[in-house]
From Swiss-Prot:
Quaternary structure and interacting proteins, as annotated: Homodimer.
PANTHER family listed in its UniProt record: GRPE PROTEIN, GRPE PROTEIN HOMOLOG, MITOCHONDRIAL
Protein's name according to its UniProt entry: Protein GrpE
Entry's Gene Ontology molecular function annotations: adenyl-nucleotide exchange factor activity; protein homodimerization activity; protein-folding chaperone binding; unfolded protein binding
Span list, region Disordered: 1-53, 210-239
Swiss-Prot/TrEMBL GO biological process terms: protein folding
A Pfam family matched in the record: GrpE
UniProt organism field: Prochlorococcus marinus (strain MIT 9515)
Amino acid sequence: MIEEQSDNVENKDENVSMDNNISENLPIAEEQTNEDKKLPDDNNEKIDAEDLKNTITNNDARLEQLEKEHETLKSQYVRIAADFDNFRKRQSRDQDDLKIQLVSKALTAILPIVDNFERARQQLKPEGDEAQTLHRSYQGLYKQLVEVLKQQGVAPMRVVGQQFDPNLHEAVLREPSEEQNEDIIIEELQRGYHLEGKVLRHALVKVSMGPGQQISQESEEKDKVDKDIDSEGSISEEN
């Protein structure tokens, strides 16, 4: 009986010892299982790295393509903007030129009237109160015309004493001058006008030939007279 109890006690001790061993080994097994889970699969890691590398390469290529497209669109935009700006400036310039042409045509028709007023102003010498009153009346009208021309951008040329310029002047007469050098304007025969910096009407002028031209002309006339005298003398001797 005592032996059976003793055996039971020993069996219980063995069971307790086994239970303790199992309990002690259980956390270790769990840790190993967790570590096994944490350990990466070499094949999966290699595949993921290749995919990531391919993705980065594709993204870089796509980014480069988008940058090229951006530069192309930017260049097209800059070119279109420049073309539009040039078109706008050209349209504005054409409109200004057309406006000047129309105004020039109208003002050119008025200029002969202004010329007549200026000739009358220089030549007429009114006598008596009635004549002076009439003179002041049409001179007032002349001033109004001049003011209208001024408001439209018309400005008279100042030519006497200036160098002759065929772009501005038209030489009607040329004559020798002891006072002015050659190609200097000595008289204005008809006034010229500018419109917005452009020639509205050329000035009709008399231009100096210079003092040397007069001496040369006198020498030619003297030589001609001498030749005539010599010719007459030869005829007399023959007779």
